[in-house]
Design a protein with these regions (language model features):
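Non-catalytic structural scaffold of enzyme domains
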Residues: 1-225
């Protein structure tokens, strides 16, 4: 079996859940499977993460930390790397160039699933940085929140990272989802932290696609082949 290297810590709870999802998926194939997994927890400060998520600032410092993690995973024996953070994929090309092993792309894996499902209008729930850098705009017809709601999503994601006001944030996020879902035939949780608030598979009759689950599925498949 191959070894996967996870660039984690963005945020820690999401990384832990992603890790367990990979194990669960591998054990569905074979109950005795215990996949080989390395995790490099990115030592990023909340201040730097918030600055990048909200304002796309601090790119140089953020990229340096991600590249260090990628190189450490390669040195540790990883056969390929995954990053369970959509926003970090702003740097996917630089990360790929920094190592000599494959790096799975959460954006590409998600696009494959959405195209297979023939989703025509996809409601996008993501960080301001993901929206600003148009990570999902290629080949997907997106329905984006209005400016105010997008700012609220940024605040909600920061609160998730700080473990603050969880119940209140869920209610606020559901209101935003209700607005977006009226124009969508699919909803995309394009921030891996959002699944901590929205575990549902459908909301208002609209199917919810979780990018973290999609990447976990692609990771397990690669581990087992």
């Amino acid at each position: 079996m191959k070894t996967v290297g996870i660039i984690g810590g963005l945020g820690p709870e999401t990384t832990a859940k992603f890790y367990m999802q990979i194990i669960s998926l591998c054990q569905k194939k074979n109950k005795t499977n215990r996949p080989s997994i390395l995790i490099s927890n990115v030592p990023i400060s909340f201040e730097l993460e918030e600055k990048f998520i909200k304002h796309s600032k601090g790119k140089k410092e953020f990229l340096s930390l991600l590249i260090d993690s990628a190189k450490n995973l390669e040195k540790g024996g990883a056969d390929f790397i995954v990053i369970p953070c959509n926003t970090a994929h702003v740097f996917i090309n630089e990360i790929k160039a920094s190592v000599n092993i494959p790096v799975l792309n959460i954006i590409d894996e998600t696009a494959k699933v959405l195209n297979k499902k023939r989703a025509k209008k996809v409601g996008l729930l993501a960080t301001p940085a993901t929206i600003k850098n148009k990570l999902f705009d290629k080949n997907i017809n997106l329905v984006k929140p209005n400016k105010f709601n997008q700012q609220q999503i940024g605040i909600i994601i920061n609160n998730i990272l700080l473990n603050q006001n969880i119940d209140k944030n869920r209610l606020e996020l559901l209101k935003i989802i209700e607005s977006v879902s009226k124009k969508s035939d699919a909803l995309l949780l394009a921030c891996t932290d959002l699944q901590l608030l929205i575990p549902e598979k459908k909301i208002n009759g609209v199917e919810v696609f979780d990018t973290m689950k999609i990447l976990a599925g692609a990771t397990a498949k690669k581990l087992l082949t």
